[in-house]
Amino acid sequence: MLYKRNPQLNKNGELIHLLSIEGLPKDIVTHILDTATNFVSVQEREVKKVPLLRGKSVFNLFFENSTRTRTTFEIAAKRLSADVFNLDIARSSTAKGETLLDTIDNLSAMAADIFVVRHSESGAPYLIAQHVAPHVHVVNAGDGRHSHPTQGLLDMYTIRHYKKDFSNLTVAIVGDVLHSRVARSDIHALTTLGAAEVRVVGPRTLVPSDMAQMGVRVFHNLEEGIKGCDVVITLRLQNERMSGALLPSSQEYFKSFGLTPEKLRLAKPDAIVMHPGPINRGVEIDSAVVDGPQAVILPQVTFGIAVRMAVMSIVAGNEA
C-alpha cells in the first residue's frame, strides 16, 4: 500500500521521482547513499565521466536563486554524460505569463528526460511529477519551505562518511528551522536511518510548533541543545522568507545562537559541523568554526555531486 500511495515510486516500489525524503523506505535511502559511494571515485579520476545518461536530456529549472545546488546538479548530469540545459527563468516565457505546466509541456516536446526543479511554491515538483509522461522523471531541488531531498541525502552521506553508524548518533540542527526545507529533509532522513536522537535548536520564533510531533527534541538554548552532540548542523537566517520581525537583529542572534569555538566545545570532541550554505559568517556561525578542523562543509559540497549523480542515474533507470 505504501508504494501505491507514494508518487515517487512505481508499482514495483522503484524510485521514479525524488520529491521528498518523507515516506521513502529506508532501503531506497540506503541504496542512494551506496550508489553515491561508487560515484565519489569517479570524481577522483582523470576523466570524470561515466556513460550512464548518454543520450538523455536534463533540464534544470531554477525558479529561485542557487549556486551550489544548480551547479552541482549540472556537474552531476554532465559527469553522467547527459545533455544539460539550464532554463533562464528571467528571460523565459514563464516571465511573460506562461504557466508552469505549459512550460513543462513545451520542454517535454523537446524530448526532456529529467526535470530538476527548484521553486518557491511548496508542492510544485509534485505537480510536475503528476503531469509528465511516464518516461520523464522529476527531481526536487527545493520547494518553498517544504523539502530539499538531495540536500538531506548529501547531509546523510556526509554524516555516514565521518561517523559510519547512525544508531548511536545525537544530531543537533541549529538555527532558522521554521523557514528551512533542509531541516525537514534532514529530520526525515535521520529518523529513517535510525539516528539515536535528533534535536532542533533555535529561538521560539524560528522553531515550528510541530517539531515534537516529528520525534525530535526541541531546545531554545544553544549550549543545552548542542551538549554532547556528535553532529551540529547550522542553518542560515532566511530573511527573504521572513514576513515580520522574528528577531531583534543579526548581532543579537549571533550572541545567543551563533556557533563559536567556545560553544562548540560543549559538543563531543570529535563532533563534526555542517552547513547547507550559503554561510553567513558572524551570524549563525563564527569564521573560526567554518575554517576550523571540525567543519566538513566543503566535503558536503563535493559529496553533493556524487549524491545527485546517484539520484539521477537511479530514477532514469526506472519506468513509471
From Swiss-Prot:
Record's catalysed reaction(s): carbamoyl phosphate + L-aspartate = N-carbamoyl-L-aspartate + phosphate + H(+)
Gene Ontology terms for molecular function: amino acid binding; aspartate carbamoyltransferase activity
Q: Which residues bind carbamoyl phosphate?
A: 68-69, 118, 148, 151, 277-278
The pathway to which it is assigned is: Pyrimidine metabolism; UMP biosynthesis via de novo pathway; (S)-dihydroorotate from bicarbonate: step 2/3
Q: Output the GO biological process annotations, alphabetical, semicolon-separated.
A: 'de novo' pyrimidine nucleobase biosynthetic process; 'de novo' UMP biosynthetic process; amino acid metabolic process
Q: Cite the PROSITE patterns for this sequence.
A: CARBAMOYLTRANSFERASE (PS00097)
Report the protein's function: Catalyzes the condensation of carbamoyl phosphate and aspartate to form carbamoyl aspartate and inorganic phosphate, the committed step in the de novo pyrimidine nucleotide biosynthesis pathway.
HAMAP family named among the record's database cross-references: Asp_carb_tr
Where L-aspartate binds, per the record, is at 96, 181, 236
Give the record's keywords alphabetically. Answer: Pyrimidine biosynthesis, Transferase
Cited SUPFAM superfamilies: Aspartate/ornithine carbamoyltransferase
- Tell me its family: Belongs to the aspartate/ornithine carbamoyltransferase superfamily. ATCase family.
Whom does it interact with, and what assembly results? Heterododecamer (2C3:3R2) of six catalytic PyrB chains organized as two trimers (C3), and six regulatory PyrI chains organized as three dimers (R2).
Specify the species.
Acidovorax ebreus (strain TPSY) (Diaphorobacter sp. (strain TPSY))
What EC designation does it have? Answer: 2.1.3.2
Q: What is this protein called?
A: Aspartate carbamoyltransferase catalytic subunit
Q: Kindly indicate whether the keyword Signal belongs to this entry.
A: no
Name a single GO cellular component. cytosol
Please, which domain of life does this record's source organism belong to? Bacteria
